[in-house]
Amino acid sequence: IREHGSGNAGGTNVFRVLGWKPALVVLIVDGFKGWFSVAVLAPVFFNAQAIPDLGVVQILCGFAAVLGHTFTIFAGFKGGKGVGTLGGMLLALFPSAFLFCLTVGILTIIFTGYVSMASIFASVSLPVFILILPPFLGTNPAPLSLMVFSLLMPFFIIFTHRSNIQQLRNGEENQFEKAMIFRKKDSD
């Protein structure tokens, strides 16, 4: 997969090169890495460490998975962009915010066709959802560690998508035109 399409091993390139079924497998595996590190590994480490806040340990474990995915030693430190793994991490930390961010991403793809833009918009919307969802759901406010993480995450996503941003500026970014269900059809 690294020799075709964009050369990235992430779900978007797998979709473009191999189709939706292999891309779904990649997305599930990437998401599982983030979810597992937060939901399963972090509590194990929390019991063995002196850090008094499980949320901090969860974020550290999850972000370690994201960094391992993004800068994998198995591919010369050139991995994916981290969106799927961050999504799995968010699913474990704050499932309702995950669903809202996913909705932002899907709507962005439907209206623009740009997956990179969807990833950026979803990440930028996260701190807003982390802040406004608890009162609507009748739950406690998000812990400070999660709020800080949600404010920093968009910078990471923008960093990993810097080449896509340049392609967007140059009008060279690939679109998923089939996903753009509201676009005008070309008439021949």
Set out the residue ranges of the language-model regions.
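Cytosolic, membrane-interface loops and tails of multi-pass inner-membrane proteins
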Residues: 1-23, 166-188
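Short, non-helical or kinked segments that cap or interrupt transmembrane helices
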Residues: 1-11, 74-87, 114-123
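Interfacial segments of multi-pass membrane proteins
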Residues: 13-20, 41-45, 82-112, 124-134
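Multi-pass membrane catalytic core of lipid/isoprenoid biosynthesis enzymes
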Residues: 16-42, 75
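Hydrophobic alpha-helical transmembrane segments
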Residues: 24, 55-63, 87, 96-103, ...
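Helix-coil boundary and interhelical linker segments in multi-pass alpha-helical membrane proteins
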Residues: 39-60, 91-98, 132-148
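C-terminal ends of transmembrane helices
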Residues: 68-78, 104-112, 162-166
